[in-house]
């Protein structure tokens, strides 16, 4: 049980180590990382002793415990405990029980629910390892990955700013500046977002507002509301910016098992039969069915993709077997699920000359026949578009999509037909994808109408094909082909590329051959390239070398050699050095040098680079970061993402949080984790190897489920103090017996230890002054400690009379 996490340097004598090791063995929750149950043989106790660890009743208070539901660890949490009868029992509220995924069947709203009346089978607390075991009937358990609205954290009220400043200087005279400022407000579940941008090109300056919008999520309805300037989000139509209002399904609010397409198993049983569905050697369905048709949905909790083998055994022992292959496309949804998107507003000037008013809607619906139906409409001045289609899983031949759209602009009709296919040939470790589209000349998209129909240079048809094949230890092979044809033939193009990636010893090698043909150029563009990357060190702060070469039939050859790497365990300092050489068919040769570095600090990310040759030079500098104003003060951080976590460890700096480079607690104990998944369980983890000396944390891991756009506050309790090994004697000259429990109460938190067989007591995180109470067999003794006892940074051994 991970109750305390610290970084200490121990220096004690040999006979003290023996006592300490024994103490750590019988008291894992104080210093160790074990989760196992411990016991010992009472025959090894001194004669005349008649006690055990269980004979001393621990004090009431709050304990950090590991919670197990039906012997499976659910989480670690601080739980209040009180004495009932001769046991220490947990105080579980209705909200806490619900957060554990248990649906209790009574309306007990008291502070501590009577668990036996709520349908919970049994609760037991193992104090020696601080583990709380809860036995619950399966019918009271929620879905494994189900999240209720009560679990969602809307975060704190905050005013926060993101900023970025870029400067580029070319040949020491041409200067380009860019500044972006994003002032944002979070209030309950409402989000106000803004972006302002400044550009300067020498003496030419522009300042503009990029967007402003207000957003709110409704988790129970699984929808998202946006008012202002935003982007469409459609699986039916192309996406573009608009000003207006949108109401749409937020697919992030669904768990994968609720929204992602998985196949359904259909069949017919001739008699009462046993149905077994296997994926490889794993049984994911084992059910009895009566005679007649049957159907089983496959959930994501059971299924990881690939071929399924179905076995039907009737009452006479006869067996029938068949195979179910499946593939999917992004448009496909879980059977019975509907996803929708409705918008009204005006196209922004970026997409339309006139900013015409429009309305748009689209719906996707997953059917029970391994298919998804979808359709939509767009309506604007002199314009109408109606779209419909189907995506279906046809088994071995893959997933297919047929999409038909019809437009009418100023009484001129056009249509677009799109056919897509995706096949994953898993037995062959291969995949095939193609996409074909044909447009009638008068077909117009919504974004074209502001430009008077944009009937010039219209696309006639397009075709793309992608093949990929895994060669296992021999690498990966892929082929891509694209063809586009226009009605006036002005921009017709063909392109093909063949790529082969493989690993040789420690080197990673990629080769690529490409062929491109454009209508506006008479000559075909043929290119060959090779890239070699070789790691020179194995640790995380790695250094790699790289070499690349490319040659074109135009006579241009380019080669590059360089080194890149990172420093520190979290790679917060990165660097890159390159030397490039370009030779053209006219004999001209250009040599260019490039050097760049970036540093991620708790307060922002800073980047600089320089490139130059004998004819030009270029310098680039960038700084980005964030400022968060909240009820507990101000935090200077890296840029906040769409959904973030503000971690607080009281006034303790330089503690590493998560895996993002440079995210450490700042001078006031705050750190920002910039990117969380909305409506999903996110684990906030402290790197225990980076905890400074003299700091003890009650926990290094917490879990949050933020709403979209939230800044959730995550507080870790920490204590500044040192570790002490007390040598205890009682007033009569004896020592407290093995298993005597010591505790020091600091606020609500209890610092606990256990006495070993030589009277040695190990306590961690002690600071200032205090009183430690020791209890055994109904007896109690106390002793004080002071600053003098804990002045050493190393483990101190202090004699005390109790």
Curated annotation (Swiss-Prot):
Keywords: Cell outer membrane, Fimbrium biogenesis, Membrane, Signal, Transmembrane, Transmembrane beta strand, Transport. Its main location: membrane. One of its GO terms (molecular function) is fimbrial usher porin activity. It is found in: Cell outer membrane. Coiled coil: none annotated. One of its GO terms (biological process) is pilus assembly. It is a multi-pass membrane protein. Pfam families: PapC_C (PF13953), PapC_N (PF13954), Usher (PF00577). SUPFAM superfamilies: FimD N-terminal domain-like. GO terms for cellular component: cell outer membrane. The keyword Ribonucleoprotein does not apply. Involved in the export and assembly of C6 fimbrial subunits across the outer membrane. Belongs to the fimbrial export usher family. This is Outer membrane usher protein CssD. It comes from Escherichia coli. The lineage of its organism: Bacteria, Pseudomonadati, Pseudomonadota, Gammaproteobacteria, Enterobacterales.
């Amino acid at each position: 049980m991970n109750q305390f996490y610290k970084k200490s340097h121990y220096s004690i004598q040999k006979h003290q180590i023996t006592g300490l090791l024994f103490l750590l063995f019988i008291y894992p929750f104080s210093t160790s990382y074990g989760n196992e149950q411990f016991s010992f043989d009472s025959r090894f106790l001194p004669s005349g002793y008649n006690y055990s660890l269980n004979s001393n009743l621990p004090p009431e208070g709050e304990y950090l415990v590991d919670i197990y539901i039906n012997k499976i660890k659910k989480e670690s949490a601080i739980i209040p405990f009180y004495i009932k009868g001769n046991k220490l029992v947990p105080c579980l509220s209705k909200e806490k029980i619900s957060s554990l995924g248990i649906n209790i069947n009574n309306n007990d709203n008291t502070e501590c629910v009577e668990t036996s009346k709520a349908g919970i089978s049994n609760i037991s607390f193992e104090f020696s390892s601080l583990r709380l075991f809860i036995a619950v009937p399966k019918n009271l358990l929620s879905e494994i990955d189900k999240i209720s609205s009560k679990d969602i954290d809307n975060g704190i009220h905050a005013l926060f700013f993101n900023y970025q400043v870029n400067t580029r200087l070319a040949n020491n005279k041409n200067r380009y500046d860019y500044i972006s400022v994003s002032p944002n407000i979070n209030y309950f579940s409402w989000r106000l977002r803004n972006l302002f941008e400044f550009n300067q090109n020498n003496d030419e300056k522009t300042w503009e507002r990029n967007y402003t919008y207000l957003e709110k999520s409704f988790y129970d309805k699984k929808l998202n509301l946006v008012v202002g300037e935003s982007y469409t989000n459609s699986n039916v139509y192309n996406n573009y910016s608009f000003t207006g209002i949108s109401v749409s399904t937020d697919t992030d609010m669904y768990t994968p098992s609720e929204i992602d397409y998985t196949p359904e198993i259909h069949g017919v049983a001739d008699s009462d039969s046993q149905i077994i569905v296997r994926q490889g050697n794993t049984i994911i369905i084992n059910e009895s069915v009566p005679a007649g048709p049957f159907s089983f949905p496959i959930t994501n909790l059971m299924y990881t993709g690939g071929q399924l083998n179905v076995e039907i055994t009737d009452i006479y022992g006869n067996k029938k077997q068949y195979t179910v292959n499946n593939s999917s496309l992004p448009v496909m949804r879980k059977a019975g699920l509907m996803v929708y998107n409705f918008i009204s507003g005006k196209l922004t000037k970026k997409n339309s000359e006139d900013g015409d008013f429009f309305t748009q809607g689209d719906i996707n619906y997953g059917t029970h026949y391994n298919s998804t139906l979808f359709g939509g409409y767009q309506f604007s001045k002199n314009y109408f578009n109606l779209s419909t289609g189907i995506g279906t899983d046809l088994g071995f031949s893959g997933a297919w999509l047929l999409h038909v759209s019809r437009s009418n602009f100023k009484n001129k009709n056009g249509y677009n037909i799109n056919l897509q296919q995706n096949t994953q040939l898993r037995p062959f470790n291969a995949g095939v994808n193609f996409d074909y589209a044909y447009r009638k000349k008068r077909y117009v998209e919504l974004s074209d109408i502001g430009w008077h129909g944009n009937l010039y240079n219209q696309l006639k048809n397009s075709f793309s094909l992608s093949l990929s094949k895994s060669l296992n230890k021999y690498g990966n092979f892929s082929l891509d082909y694209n063809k586009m044809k226009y009605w006036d033939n002005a921009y017709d193009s063909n392109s093909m590329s063949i790529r082969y990636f493989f690993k040789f010893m420690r080197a990673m090698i990629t080769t690529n051959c490409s062929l491109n043909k454009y209508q506006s150029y008479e000559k075909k563009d043929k290119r060959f390239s090779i890239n070699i990357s070789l790691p020179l060190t194995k640790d995380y702060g790695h250094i790699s070398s790289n070499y690349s070469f490319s040659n074109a039939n135009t006579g241009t050859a380019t080669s590059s050699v360089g080194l890149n790497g990172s420093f520190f365990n979290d790679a917060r300092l990165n660097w890159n050095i390159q030397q490039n050489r370009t030779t053209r068919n006219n004999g001209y040769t250009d040599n260019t040098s490039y050097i760049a570095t970036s540093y991620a600090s708790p307060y922002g990310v800073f980047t600089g680079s320089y490139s130059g040759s004998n004819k030009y030079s270029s310098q680039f500098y960038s700084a980005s970061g964030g400022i968060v104003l909240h009820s507990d003060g101000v935090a200077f951080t890296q840029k906040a993402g769409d959904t973030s976590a503000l971690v607080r460890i009281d006034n303790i700096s330089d503690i590493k949080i998560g895996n993002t480079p440079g995210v450490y607690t700042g001078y006031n104990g705050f750190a920002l984790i910039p990117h969380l998944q909305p409506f999903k369980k996110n684990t906030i983890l402290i790197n225990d190897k980076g905890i400074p000396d003299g700091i003890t944390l009650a926990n290094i891991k917490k879990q949050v489920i933020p709403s979209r756009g939230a800044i959730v506050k995550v507080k870790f309790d920490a204590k500044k103090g040192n570790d002490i090994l007390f040598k205890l004697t009682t007033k009569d000259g004896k020592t407290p017996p093995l298993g005597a429990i010591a505790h020091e109460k600091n606020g609500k938190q209890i610092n606990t230890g256990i006495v070993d067989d030589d009277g040695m007591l190990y306590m961690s995180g002690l600071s200032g002054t205090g009183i430690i109470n020791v209890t055994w067999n109904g007896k109690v003794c106390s002793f004080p400690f002071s600053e003098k006892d804990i002045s050493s940074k190393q483990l101190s051994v202090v004699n005390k009379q109790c």
